[in-house]
Every structure is written in structure tokens, then in C-alpha cells.
UniProtKB/Swiss-Prot annotation:
Signal sequence bounds: none
UniProt keyword annotations, A-Z: Cell inner membrane, Cell membrane, Chaperone, Disulfide bond, Electron transport, Membrane, Oxidoreductase, Redox-active center, Transmembrane, Transmembrane helix, Transport
Family (UniProt): Belongs to the DsbB family.
Cytoplasmic side: 1-11, 64-70, 165-173
Residues that span the membrane, as ranges: 12-28, 47-63, 71-88, 146-164
Organism annotation: Xylella fastidiosa (strain Temecula1 / ATCC 700964)
Gene Ontology terms for molecular function: electron transfer activity; protein-disulfide reductase activity
Gene: dsbB
Keyword Protein biosynthesis recorded: no
Gene Ontology CC: plasma membrane
Pfam families, alphabetized: DsbB (PF02600)
PANTHER family in UniProt: DISULFIDE BOND FORMATION PROTEIN B (PTHR36570:SF3)
The protein's name in its UniProt record: Disulfide bond formation protein B
Periplasmic topology ranges: 29-46, 89-145
GO-annotated biological processes: protein folding
Length: 173
């Protein structure tokens, strides 16, 4: 069956399942494989969680209004683009030589206790902590590279569900 012809609800719930699966795998790697997430990884997880919630709400609400569907598609697309930016920054940090970037030094829990939310966000994006380490690879790509791939795929799915033309029944058959 062609996934491009699935209903709005089925496509949104598929997006939700992908986000849930990606988050479940990240938690599995943390709890059972011992891979501790860096602050940029945590921000990517938050972006996947927000994407999943948006897909779930869109799928459960299943509006027949064209403008509501476009709004959902646009929100999903923008959230995925933000996630792509965070993952892109993480990939950039990993590809830079380790001695050229300063370390942010503190874990995210400490930063959130001592700074405001915008300062934490700025500090995490400008520093590296352990974000430059590549501890996991699959098919030659690191975790942030795979995250970037999935963010782009989910952004395209958001555009598809929000802006695909509905088949219209002929007026006279």
C-alpha cells in the first residue's frame, strides 16, 4: 500500500510512532548501553517529543478543515526544522577538532538550576560539554547525523500531511 495515499490520520499517527520509536531507542541506549546524553542530545529529544505530540494531536483531532490541516503541517514542519538546526549544530561540533572549541563544562541539570532558560539554551548551543564525542555509529553515521536525517524526514512528512491535495469526488458520476 502506498503511504502517500494514506489518510491524514494514518500519516499523522505514523509520524507519532516514528517519534516514539526514536525516543524509545534513545532511552534504551541511555539505560541499557550506558550512553549518557549530552545537552544537545537532550534538546534533540525534546524536539522529537514535541514533534510526536504535534503528530498525535493532529492525528487524533483529524480535522477535515483544510486550513487546520495546513496549520498542523506548518507547526510540524517548523518544529522539525528547529530540531534539524539543533542536530546540525551537534554534527558541526562533532566534526570540529576537539581543541578548537571551548567546553561548556557543566551538565544540563546544573545549568538549568543556575541560569534562566534562554541563557541555558545559549550556553548549550555555544559550548560542547561532551557533545563532541562520537560514542555510537550506525552505517558510518553518528547519532546526531541520524537525528538530522529523521528531523528532515519528519519535516517532509509534516509538509505532506498538511499540504497534500485531497482527492475530490466528481460532481456527477
Amino acid at each position: 500500500m502506498n503511504a502517500l495515499q494514506w489518510s491524514f490520520r494514518a500519516q499523522c499517527l505514523t509520524g507519532f510512532l516514528f517519534c516514539t520509536g526514536l525516543l524509545a531507542y534513545a532511552i534504551f541506549l541511555q539505560l541499557h548501553q550506558g550512553l549518557e546524553p549530552c545537552p544537545l542530545c537532550i534538546f534533540q529529544r525534546i524536539a522529537f517529543a514535541v514533534l510526536g505530540i504535534l503528530f498525535l494531536i493532529a492525528g487524533l483531532y483529524n480535522s477535515s478543515n483544510v486550513y487546520t490541516r495546513k496549520a498542523y503541517g506548518l507547526l510540524i514542519f517548523l518544529t522539525a526544522i528547529i530540531g534539524t538546526g539543533i542536530a546540525g549544530r551537534h554534527v558541526w561540533v562533532q566534526l570540529m577538532p576537539h581543541n578548537t572549541i571551548s567546553s561548556c563544562g557543566s551538565p544540563l541539570s546544573f545549568l538549568s538550576e543556575t541560569m534562566g532558560p534562554f541563557e541555558v539554551f545559549r550556553t548549550v548551543l555555544t559550548g560542547t560539554s561532551n557533545c563532541g564525542n562520537i560514542d555510537w555509529r550506525f552505517l558510518g553515521l553518528s547519532m546526531p547525523m541520524w537525528s538530522m536525517f529523521w528531523f528532515v524526514a519528519l519535516a517532509l512528512l509534516g509538509l505532506l500531511v498538511g499540504f497534500k491535495a485531497e482527492r475530490r469526488k466528481p460532481l456527477f458520476s
